[in-house]
Amino acid sequence: ERRLEARSWRLAVTTHPPGAQLSIRAAGGAARRARSPYKGTLRGGELELTVTRAGYERLVQRVTLDRHRALDLWLDPPGLLHHKLGELRSGSNPKQVAFSPDGRELWVSLLGGHGVEVFDTRTMRKRKAIRLGQHGAVEVLFTRDGRTVYASQMETASVWEIDRASFRVRRQLATKGNWSKVMALSPDERTLYVANWVSNDISEIDLRKGRVRRLLRTVRTPRGLWPTADGRRLYVAGFENGDLERIDLATGKSRTLLRTGGAMRHLVGDPEGRRLYADDMGTNQAFVVDLASERVRKLAATDNVPNTIDLTPDGRVLYVSNRGRNGSSYYLPGPEWGSVLAIDTASGKVLDAMVGGNQTTGLDVSADGRLLAFSDFLDNRIHLFAVPPYRELAAGGGGRAAAHRAELAKR
């Protein structure tokens, strides 16, 4: 502590929104009061920053001033249980976001760009833009060790294999389908499954050989995929009719477990392999499947036009991004803001809710369960939040589950 206090350092504090009251207190010292944005020179050491502004939650931040520091702090609306850490500006139409397994990077697929962008989650700065030919990317998928990344591309009906360390493309894998979107790796990671939206099939790619082993026929417009841990079954979300289909990978035969008449979009399984979750863009619902019996039931109602879903590592919270009511075109802003819901998988209750921007779409939870990222497709923006422990969510009285609804309609 004495060494830190031996010299002074510059401190800059920016808040969102600006005009917040700052209280800067050194250990055992008096508080210095100011208004954001703030720039000053202070003695080094441990500082406690308290940020307040009418209409927002109070924020307390502890900082070690051992170098020149610039802080970018976000104030949360009343009742929000998640804390916003920052925003990232991306390229055109961020379709999906994915944390690397070690949580150090966030990869963003750009449907309207030319590939993917990579951000450092600590500094929130862009590390790399990876060009994938003349088109954008739909989804990105990591291997468990985080060394390899796959990016799907609709226009070329292919998957690009990328070396994460060097950001270099190793190879481009043809799917032999049409309009390839969602990917899933087999449990042994020797096979890549790719959903082909227009040709109504799944490409089963042998990754050692780099070739399609077979094409599996599916329900119309397959999107979400989930292979079981034993490698025997593959579940498929069918968008056209709201189908949830199961394929026997030994025989290729299939069975439709549910048809809602809506638009089934995304699938994610729990870590124990007991439950599968699905969301339907047409009916604004989330479903849960008991994988032993294959019985399907409604878990919860969502906001309008749910998109991507993901689970916390313990399987206790399901996050759902919601695009909001559509405008006159998919590529035009609609009358509602997007949102993200945190749903208790045991009860189906909404534990908290965050309001996004125009067409909140991509979503991912980090492997350690500490970070949540989601994208606003039409705003070219990524939001990064800290995820509270489950016990805080469960005891939070629903957070902003009710309050956020009044903020969705644009004024």
For every predicted segment, state its role.
Residues 1-83, 386:
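Short loop/turn and low-complexity linker motifs enriched in small/turn-promoting residues
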Residues 10, 72-411:
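Predominantly soluble domains enriched in secretory-pathway, periplasmic, or organellar proteins
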